[in-house]
Amino acid sequence: HAIIRKLLESPKVERIYCAPGNGGISCDAQCVDINAMDKDSMVTFAKQNGIDFAVVAPDDPLAAGMVDAMEEAGIPAFGPTANAAVIESSKVFSKNLMKQYGIPTAGYEVFDDSASAIAYIEQNNTFPIVVKADGLALGKGVIIAENLQAAKDAVQSIMEDKIFGQSGNKIVVEEFITGPEVSVLAFTDGKTLKPMVSSKDHKRALDNDKGL
């Protein structure tokens, strides 16, 4: 909604459609009943309504290639392609990328079966420890385990019970580090970088750092 409000300030913007949108957004844009993951329907709507520019914001359609689909249809789109979005959609990829290029990151190991993950956690025997689903999980794919049993339960729930679906086919078992978390985002066209102001995301669902 904030993006839509800002775009409306531009004299170049005549009309904005949002799919699927919500009650609040309907005050500023025309909401369209299309699933955000439905690339074919989204492209068809854009063509039929003479859309000049598409802004793809959510993680899931970015990872699924919505920007790619729009650009293939000749519609300029803002957002990373599926290949670029993998740095967000796969924690395994992003951790390995940081390791490859010497970018400081918490120590970690990657596992694709629960038995190996639990064996490593038992051998490591250091807590708290962090268990992360590889794929997208609506921001809830990270579990901080305070003890061995909690770590085993986390591995079981992610890899065997599939609480995050296929996003839990692989996991990252990561060193727990403390300190303030800061998000720094930037806009880029591949040549120029324009940083935004820093921000802090409150990860827990409940007060007093409780919940996932």
Model-based region annotation:
Residues H1-A82, A115:
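ATP-binding N-terminal substructure of ATP-dependent carboxylate-amine bond-forming enzymes
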Residues C18-A19, V55-V56, A77-P80, G107-V110, ...:
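General beta-strand structural signal in soluble alpha/beta enzymes
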Residues C27-A29, V43, V86-V92, L206-N208:
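Short, charged, surface-exposed secondary-structure boundary motifs
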Residues F78-G141:
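A conserved helix-loop-beta module that forms one wall/lid of the active-site cleft
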Residues P104-G107, T126-V130, A145-S183, F187, ...:
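Conserved ATP-binding module of the ATP-grasp superfamily
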Residues T188-T192:
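Short acidic-glycine loop/turn motifs at beta-strand connectors
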Residues L193-L212:
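ATP-dependent carboxylate/phosphate-activation module, predominantly the ATP-grasp catalytic core
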